[in-house]
């Protein structure tokens, strides 16, 4: 994809990152004390049973209760905290597509004359389309690793895929599903380690009317699950977090939390909802009659 002109328009470069690298960096930041902020303790394996938005109290499945000034529900597409928001009883569901995910060493692709031409350019995202399926490839980890998303009709891998992130996929099945693609692309797919291929259903959800209630606010996929066709899920979640940090300054009185969360919702809801809609449009099958609104 040639992004020179769009980068001039938006004034910001398009950055591609390996998700685990981003996770590790964020973890280091929050767990490392500085002169300005103490280290933040992380309590893993703490499954939520319910949330009281009015008192900002979380009850864990083991009965432990934790109370604070505000609860931020950033618990993903299968969010429990969403259910404490009026109108938030929606569930994400598959809309007909699944995706294989896997990594390939760029050196391995470059060393093969059949696949080298597909990966020779630095920092290039490539998409290969079929009418109802597509393969997305982009570099991560300083151009040393190629990250793949192979989107296809859900029915063709239904016996393997589910709604979790760790479901193992079958390399041979993937190659069969994309058998109509160029042989060089299939050779590139074949370089995936058979044990590293994952597959899951792509989930979407109707728009919820509000992201906040009393002293609870939603963030990221808990508020707006995105289909992956623009690669915006992580970026918009970070935007949510930055916006929340602005409206909830360090010395915000508890009595003002509700109004501040309403402001957060007003700032973020329309933008995220629009990106959700554009992601759906871009993900539509290429039938020749689905055009994005030029406006």
What are these regions (language model features)?
Residues 72-73, 100, 137, 174, ...:
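Conserved mid-domain beta->alpha element of the FAD-binding
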Residues 46, 117, 121-123, 131-135, ...:
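FAD/FMN-dependent oxidoreductases across multiple families
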Residues 49, 56, 66, 79, ...:
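Glycine-centered loop/turn positions within well-structured domains
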Residues 91, 124-128:
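Short Gly/Pro-enriched turn/cap motifs at secondary-structure boundaries
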Residues 27, 31, 49, 82, ...:
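Amphipathic alpha-helical interaction motifs in eukaryotic regulatory proteins
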Residues 107-114:
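Short helix-loop capping/hinge motifs at secondary-structure junctions, enriched
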Residues 1-105, 157-160, 167-171:
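Conserved N-terminal helical subregion
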Residues 283-295:
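C-terminal domain-closing interface element
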């Amino acid at each position: 994809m040639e992004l020179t002109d769009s980068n001039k328009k938006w004034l910001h470069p398009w950055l591609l990152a390996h998700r685990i690298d981003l996770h590790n960096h964020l973890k280091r930041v929050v767990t490392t004390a500085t002169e300005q902020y103490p280290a933040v303790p992380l309590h893993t394996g703490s499954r939520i049973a319910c949330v009281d938005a009015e008192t900002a109290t979380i009850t864990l499945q083991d009965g432990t209760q934790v109370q604070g000034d505000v609860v931020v529900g950033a618990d993903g597409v299968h969010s429990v905290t969403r259910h404490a928001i009026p109108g938030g009883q929606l569930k994400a569901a598959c809309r007909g597509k699944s995706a294989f995910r896997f990594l390939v060493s760029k050196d391995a692709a470059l060393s093969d004359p059949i696949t080298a031409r597909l990966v020779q350019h630095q920092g290039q995202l490539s998409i290969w389309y079929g009418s109802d399926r597509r393969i997305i490839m982009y570099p991560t980890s300083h151009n040393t690793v190629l990250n793949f998303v192979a989107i296809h009709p859900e029915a063709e891998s239904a016996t393997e895929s589910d709604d979790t992130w760790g479901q193992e996929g079958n390399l041979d099945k993937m190659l069969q599903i994309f058998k109509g693609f160029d042989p060089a692309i299939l050779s590139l797919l074949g370089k995936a380690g058979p044990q590293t291929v994952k597959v899951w259903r792509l989930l979407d959800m109707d728009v919820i009317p509000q992201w906040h209630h009393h002293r609870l606010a939603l963030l990221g996929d808990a508020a707006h699950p995105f289909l992956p066709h623009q690669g915006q899920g992580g970026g918009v979640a970070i935007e949510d977090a930055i916006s929340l940090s602005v409206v909830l300054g360090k010395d915000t009185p508890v009595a003002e939390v509700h109004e501040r969360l309403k402001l957060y919702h007003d700032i973020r809801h329309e933008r995220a909802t629009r990106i959700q809609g554009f992601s759906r449009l871009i993900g539509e099958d290429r039938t020749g009659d689905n055009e994005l609104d030029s406006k």
